[in-house]
Curated annotation (Swiss-Prot):
It catalyses: alpha-D-glucose 6-phosphate = beta-D-fructose 6-phosphate. InterPro entries: G6P_Isomerase (IPR001672), G6P_Isomerase_C (IPR023096), Phosphoglucose_isomerase_CS (IPR018189), SIS_dom_sf (IPR046348), SIS_PGI_1 (IPR035476), SIS_PGI_2 (IPR035482). Keywords: Cytoplasm, Gluconeogenesis, Glycolysis, Isomerase. This is Glucose-6-phosphate isomerase, cytosolic 1. The keyword Cytoplasm applies. Its EC number is 5.3.1.9. SUPFAM superfamilies: SIS domain. It is found in: Cytoplasm. The gene is PGIC1. GO terms for cellular component: cytosol. Pathway: Carbohydrate degradation; glycolysis; D-glyceraldehyde 3-phosphate and glycerone phosphate from D-glucose: step 2/4. Belongs to the GPI family.
Amino acid sequence: MASPALISETEAWKDLKAHLEGIKTTHLRELMGDTERCQSMMVEFDNIFLDYSRQQASPDTINKLYKLADAAHLKQKIDRMYNGDHINITENRSVLHVALRAPRNSAICSDGKNVVPDVWNVLDKIKDFSDRVRNGSWIGATGKELKDVIAVGIGGSFLGPLFVHTALQTDPEASKNARGRELRFLANVDPIDVARNISGLNPETTLVVVVSKTFTTAETMLNARTLREWISSALGPSAVAKHMVAVSTNLPLVEKFGIDPINTFAFWDWVGGRYSVCSAVGVLPLSLQYGFAVVEKFLQGAHSIDQHFSSAPFEKNIPVLLGLLSVWNVSFLGYPARAILPYSQALEKLAPHIQQVSMESNGKGVSIDGLPLPFESGEIDFGEPGTNGQHSFYQLIHQGRVIPCDFIGVVKSQQPVYLKGEVVNNHDELMSNFFAQPDALAYGKTPEQLKKENVSEHLIPHKTFTGNRPSLSILLPTLDAYRIGQLLAIYEHRVAVQGFVWGINSFDQWGVELGKSLATQVRKQLHASRVKGEPVEGFNFSTKTLLTRYLEATSDVPADPSTLLPNI
């Protein structure tokens, strides 16, 4: 008998639907009272501890989710990814970001070819180049050392490397290696982002890394041309070869731009942008800032989770458990969002990166076979470090909409602070909130409890917390390069699990194309109106009105302006 075309047509899905009502009427207060249940919902790997006992789920729920995973052929899909099969069928590509952090002696194939040697050729080239820049043997056009780096990219070429950079900045080993150096990321085509990036920097000591696979990405290439002008206007056109390098596959366009192809670092079609932080996209700028040895530890951490994900049984497999619970929360309990709440300021850019990884991967409305999905998939991801978020949006999480939460804590702070006479140290104060918030969400506070506390009758409705709000807790032992790599890979694979179970293609992103094509039409109109004075035509009334208003208000912009760079 053929497998159902949609996962929602399987008996496992229908069984979970039937199971749903019993769970909805069982409060987390009751579920948390079952010690045996709680113990069964705690998993540890390599000193990473996952506690998902505060999920709205019973052991029976979890077993039914395992059956759903089997019905979705989850294990086979994971194996196909690792085997280099073209699981991204709309672009006919392998999905092999795991190869980017594989040990040198590994064998991971795409189209019958082991890609690991190619990966390590690029890594070796990055190590050699970053070492030369850092030790001063590669210098700028005027003989000065290149201490400052601006990485130019957008989307996955920006958010992932920025997350890792921000997480490493306060790590003792990494911060020591980065002394006297500066790493910035230019992503937005907004000239304000250009101004902020070049502010305080000297072109003589600045190296620009342009990240674009095709070297045609509109925003990235406009920013790259802007920085090329910034360098050449200060140092002369010939300086570009010493002050700009590329991460790209399009060597002819790189050379035409003025960058020596020798100073180009490759990556491959089997690497999606949002999964590319472990390629030259992230490894090159991060190695320039922190040294290759630190970044290699990051890659090793990611690889450790790759191995865990591919080999651990589902009941002990952290990414699988997280992915299945997300499917349960989104498609069965009907919760459309997820809050990512790291209790570490070093992880302040985790949520924005995972927002892209998750929402670009799983924001799909059709199955991998092109069938409309009759259920909700994907979730809205957002977050902020604790305790900052507690003074921002936790009000809604506690007393408004139900939003499942990921609490991420770190046992040992990167930068401990102790003050004599304080009841607890700074990190203990932070972690007190990490441990308290999940219980507040799960248990809430009843009117009866408030009455016993002699709360005024008219305030009781306002101070009541319904509880029964699901969360999970991830406890990391430390936050060094290795652990940062592990955390990244956990979330990458979690997203893949969700997509595999929902039966969607998590590795394409056609949703970004329509807006880009319409922007091309607008761009042509702006040029025609500014240069030739042509009226706005070919748009709906709303867009025509807005465009006309914009053009009239910027009529002082010259049709053929001379170069003007930010002055800040």
